[in-house]
A protein has these predicted regions:
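Acidic, surface-exposed loops and disordered segments
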Residues: 1-196
Length: 196
């Protein structure tokens, strides 16, 4: 992969919030986790743990996770994907309860999440990092009994919406938005405005 191909992969690894509704096989979720295990962590602690949820093997568990997620705060009139548009599986990113709010460990979570997202994009899958979820999800999946907290959930599935990256418009701001055709627009600042 050359630099242009990598740039295209990063640009394609957007937050997808609508999916085809097709379940993701557990082996594909595990392949994403396998990529994330190579991501760097502070002091090489490797404290992150992952839970592959739902997919073809457990649609009931996927519905359970979905019921605890809160989607797209910037889209005020949208309550999340409808049946038939929901993710095909999930990956819960977990930390030991004793360090689940440690800033360095949360950096590890972000690095792993981006790795998972890029791995999903490389397989043609959409992914969305969801931080807004009900705290009881950790207990419902039995992870609290193992001493872990869910700190991030990644929704994964075949893409079911068009996402367009476009130059930021100063009059519109940086919030993502949907047009009348349902196309999801993601404004991005130009490179010169990021350099200081």
């Amino acid at each position: 992969m050359d630099g242009k191909e990598f740039q295209a992969l990063v640009e394609g690894a957007r937050s997808y919030r609508r999916y085809s509704g097709e379940a993701v096989p557990r082996e594909e979720l595990l392949a994403l986790i396998d990529a994330a295990r190579f991501a760097p962590t502070g002091n090489n602690t490797q404290l992150l743990r992952f839970r592959a949820v739902g997919g073809k093997e457990d649609p009931a568990e996927a519905r359970q996770v979905f019921s605890h997620l809160h989607w797209a705060a910037a889209l005020k009139d949208w309550d999340g994907p409808e049946p038939g548009e929901r993710p095909g599986g999930y990956i819960a990113v977990c930390l030991p309860t004793s360090v689940s709010s440690n800033p360095v460990r949360l950096l590890d979570v972000g690095i792993a999440a981006q790795t998972l997202s890029l791995a999903a994009a490389s397989l043609g899958l959409g992914c969305c990092m969801v931080k807004s979820f009900d705290a009881c999800l950790t207990g419902e999946l039995g992870l609290d009994r193992k001493g872990y907290d869910i700190v991030l959930v990644l929704a994964v599935g075949p893409r079911g919406e068009k996402v367009v990256v476009e130059p930021a418009d100063p009059d519109r701001g940086l919030a993502y938005w949907r047009d009348d055709e349902g196309v999801h627009h993601v404004p991005k600042l130009p490179l010169p405005s990021l350099l200081i």
